[in-house]
UniProtKB/Swiss-Prot annotation:
Zn(2+) 1 binds at residues 9, 12, 20, 25. Transcription activator that binds DNA on 5'-ACTCTAC-3' and promotes auxin homeostasis-regulating gene expression (e.g. YUC genes), as well as genes affecting stamen development, cell expansion and timing of flowering. Synergistically with other SHI-related proteins, regulates gynoecium, stamen and leaf development in a dose-dependent manner, controlling apical-basal patterning. Promotes style and stigma formation, and influences vascular development during gynoecium development. May also have a role in the formation and/or maintenance of the shoot apical meristem (SAM). This is Protein SHI RELATED SEQUENCE 3. Disulfide bonds: none annotated. It is found in: Nucleus. InterPro entries: SHI, SHI_C, Znf_LRP1. It comes from Arabidopsis thaliana. Disruption phenotype: No visible phenotype. Its main location: nucleus. Keywords: Activator, Auxin biosynthesis, Auxin signaling pathway, Developmental protein, DNA-binding, Metal-binding, Nucleus, Zinc. Pfam families: DUF702.
């Protein structure tokens, strides 16, 4: 039994489309800029454009851990989420007494909306709140004692609690 093979592309040897008058595959026909009616009608999109289009149509999720998808509708946000954020150490002062304190400023993007805020020092807290961690997990965190001699520039943390509307006096640079 003899098998009838399709036409081969004259340039690369791949299978040519049977109606192509130039006897080329799609890629070679397009790359040589032939005005082939068979390939013009085709809905084929080059691989580099497909992946580029796919990345453009998907929402960015840099602040959401891999495997977690948060779908937000306009005006509706998740009651709670966990994300990574960079915190900058800043000096803040109260309008009432003018006393300077250290705080951390951050900005996060949730569902395309930008949230910016400052975390104020609430004093020492030795008990971790089970609100953010599963009681059965083996997550251990060391509590750091505050030090007035050093203030790190960046800290990565999964917490995103804010006090809005607070002004800060200057950003510490070290």
């Amino acid at each position: 039994m003899m098998m009838i093979m399709g036409r081969k592309c004259e340039d690369c040897g791949n299978q040519a489309k049977k109606d192509c008058v130039y006897m080329r595959c799609r890629t070679c026909c397009k790359s040589k800029a032939f005005h082939c009616q068979t390939h013009i009608k085709s809905t084929w999109v080059p691989a580099y454009r497909r992946s580029h289009h796919k990345h453009q149509s998907q929402p960015l999720s840099t602040s959401i851990p891999k495997g977690v998808q948060i779908h937000t509708t306009p005006g509706h946000f998740p009651a709670e989420l966990s994300s990574l954020a960079d915190f900058r150490c800043v000096k803040v002062s109260s309008i009432d007494d003018g006393k300077e304190q250290y705080a951390y400023q951050t900005t996060v993007n949730i569902g395309g909306h930008v949230f910016r805020g400052i975390l104020h020092d609430q004093g020492l807290h030795k008990v971790m709140v089970d609100h953010h961690y599963n009681k059965n997990s083996n997550n251990h965190q060391e509590l750091l004692t505050p030090s007035t001699s050093s203030c790190p520039l960046k800290i990565t943390s999964p917490f995103t609690d804010f006090m809005f509307g607070t002004r800060f006096s200057s950003v510490l640079r070290r």
